[in-house]
């Protein structure tokens, strides 16, 4: 019998983030408490999002609105890293970044966790920014997925290519 396997990745669907950004921009444009504050939210490059407003508390509230929209679109908060508000002339800015891929440090933590606490006979391989987990039994793979969902890791994980 062939080995069963799955891949652990950390990727964000850019289209879903774009939808959340557009929903947040629409809400910021129409909400009463944001009137006259020149609050904007926009892409800044491929992985960065910039929020600007006239006051520090309004830019923090704009970040909260954006995070709420991300949650509604099933995007983990671990995938979005919002910076601190920075004064820039008469406005305040917050630069946020999307975290994609599993760093080698986090990959080592995850493989060590699987080796130490996972079922016996489960093998892991680090392949760039993803991890391949294989085993003879599919039940062991499902146990690994359940264990990783319960673990408190600082990376948003998705499980793909389950075969």
Curated annotation (Swiss-Prot):
Nucleotide-binding protein. This is Nucleotide-binding protein MAV_4575. It comes from the Bacteria. PANTHER family: UPF0234 PROTEIN YAJQ. Belongs to the YajQ family. One of its GO terms (molecular function) is nucleotide binding. It comes from Mycobacterium avium (strain 104). GO terms for cellular component: cytosol. InterPro entries: DUF520, UPF0234-like_C, UPF0234_N, YajQ-like_sf. Keywords: Nucleotide-binding.
């Amino acid at each position: 019998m062939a080995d069963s396997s799955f891949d652990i990745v950390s990727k964000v669907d850019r289209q879903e983030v774009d939808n959340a950004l557009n929903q947040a921009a629409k809400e910021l444009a129409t909400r009463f408490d944001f009137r006259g504050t020149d609050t904007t939210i926009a892409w800044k490059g491929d992985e960065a999002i910039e929020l600007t407003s006239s006051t520090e508390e309004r830019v923090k509230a704009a970040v909260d609105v954006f995070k709420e929209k991300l949650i509604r679109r099933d995007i983990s908060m671990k995938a979005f890293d919002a910076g601190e508000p920075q004064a820039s002339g008469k406005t305040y800015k917050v630069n946020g970044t999307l975290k994609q891929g599993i760093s080698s440090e986090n990959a080592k933590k995850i493989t060590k966790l699987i080796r130490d606490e996972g079922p016996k006979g489960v093998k892991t391989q680090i392949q760039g920014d993803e991890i391949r987990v294989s085993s003879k039994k599919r039940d062991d793979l499902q146990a690994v997925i359940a264990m990783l969902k319960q673990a408190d890791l600082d990376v948003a994980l998705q499980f793909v290519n389950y075969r």
